[in-house]
Amino acid sequence: MAEQHRLRLGRVSIPGQAYHIITASHGRAPVFADIRVARAVIGVIGRMHQDGWLHSHAWALMSDHLHWLFTLGERASLSATMNRFKSGSGRQVRAERPDLARVWQDGFFDHGVRRDEDLRAIARYIIANPLRAGLCVNVGDYPWWYAEWL
């Protein structure tokens, strides 16, 4: 609980603000290595974009965590948006993998992108995660990433 409180300290939720979010699977289990689970999570990311909760700029779904760069929409706060994502994706994942009691760890890390920061540079950092983790030799070889500029 104290860990969760520290995650929330200083959190500011501003519609139209870009955020880099990192959220992990429960117990850092490699559940997203399962193609069915990865597709379920990616489907919810797409629906949240289509439904106007946010505007996705880039994301990389790793085996045990998600990096996501988006601009927050007008519909809800950052915390409410992430709660919707985690609950919706959790339901979809458990439909594919009923053996998973929990999908996500509590909380998430967020970085509000400053005006002087380059969204494309952050997107490059995000999509290079599979390279740095040794999961692929070329970004294009890793299936679970997106960047609107590529």
What is the meaning of each model-derived region?
Residues M1-L150:
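Short catalytic/metal-binding and nucleic-acid-binding patches
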